[in-house]
Structures are given as C-alpha cells and as structure tokens.
Amino acid sequence: MKKILVLTVLVCGIAMSASAQTAKAQWVTIVTPNLKCWECKKLLDDYLNKVNGVQFEKGLIQWKFNLIKGEIRIQYWPDRANPNAIKTAIANGGFDADQIKATEDAYKTLPPSCKRAEDGGGPKKGKPCHMEPHN
C-alpha cells in the first residue's frame, strides 16, 4: 500500500512539474506608424507568415492589426520568440516597429501608401486607406 501511495505522489509530482514548465503564450503590442492601409496589412501579414515558419519555428500564434492606430498585436510563445526579435522581423519586412526603423532595402520595396508620412505615404485627405476598396 505504501509503495502505491509513494508511486502515486511521485507521478503527480512529475506531472505537475511538466505542466509548470510549459510557457504561457504572451502578447506584445507594437506601434507601426506606416501600417495604415489594407495593402500594407496584406504585405506585413504575408511577411509574418513567411518568417513565422523559418525564423520563429511557428512561435507566432496570431496577430491582429489596428490600422487606425497603426499597431499590431502579436501573440507568441516566449520559448520561440521575444518582442525584440519580433520587432526586428517587422523592420526587416519594411515597417517601423516601435523605436526600430525599417531596414532601408525592405522599406524601398513598399508601395507609396505604405511609406512614412514624411515620405508622402499614408492616408490622403478624402481617401481612407484603412478599408479595402470595393470593386
């Protein structure tokens, strides 16, 4: 009887230890001021899908865009990704990410609507670009 009790306690302890080591998914909100347009959203979405498998080992779970605020919220596994690596990946995709500026080569490939406001990009008066146009 004592052996069964000891074995049960041991198994429960190992199971609790294993579940305690599982990292919880976390969220990070990143300001991307040149992310104001549905076209920019599509470009960044495609880029994140591409790097998620290569760079982050599927560590990015999901992301949500707020085109009005120019923000992206990303849920990630902390054992596979971290906020600085995510910001660097966004910058490598051509978009500013908090204080990290987009890499120049990637930024040059963006369409005019996805450029920084000081470079003539972003929404134009009377043309909201946060909504996909209807054909």
Question: How should these model regions be labeled?
Answer:
Residues 1-25:
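Bacterial Sec-dependent N-terminal signal peptides
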Residues 14, 31-34, 107-108, 123:
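Processing junctions and N-termini across compartments
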